Amino acid sequence: MKMMRNVDKFRLFQWLLLLGCLLCVPHSAQAQAWDGEGDIKVYAGYANVGGKSGMELGSDYALSDFVSVGGQLTYVNVKDYDEGRDRAFMGYDFSLTGNYHWAEVLKLPSVLDIYSGVSVGLRAAGLQAGVRYNFSETFGLYGQVRQNLVKTFGNDVEYGRVYQGKTALSVGLTVTF
């Protein structure tokens, strides 16, 4: 497994520092990270999968006060110049997700949501956990870690290699509808 480049580590550190600072700021009772049934979250941010940088875009829909389903598209930059073939398509993965939200069970402040769940994608399937912090009624931040356990679809063994067995870290912004 390749190590993260120093630039990627620094960017991740910046995002985590920003998230930590915002968590320490007094929050408004109006902002809610998890509204329960019918809540829709759209999120976008930086993604790092096994040392490869990229981005992700996703959405969650709350089926109940505790359970949500959604989808996410992740792209990481895949460079493979040695074989002279275009490998850019290998960097994409679309996943369906299911999460359990712990905010009510753990009696967390309304601006904070901790969740865990599963994801099944075109490239890999695995487990995930994350946290959301809303600093306003509409906008917030998120951080998520996903461990891709197994390769899912595709005949080409190389397609699964980008995601299979890799840890994915992501941070970014959320919008509540």
What are these regions (language model features)?
Residues 35-39, 107-113, 152-154:
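Flexible, solvent-exposed coil segments and beta strand-coil junctions
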Residues 1-37, 177:
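Cleavable N-terminal export/targeting peptides
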Residues 27-69, 96-98, 103, 176:
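Short glycine/proline- and aromatic-enriched beta-strand/turn motifs that initiate or cap beta-hairpins
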Residues 43-49, 74-76, 101, 119-123, ...:
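Outer-membrane beta-barrel pore domains and translocons
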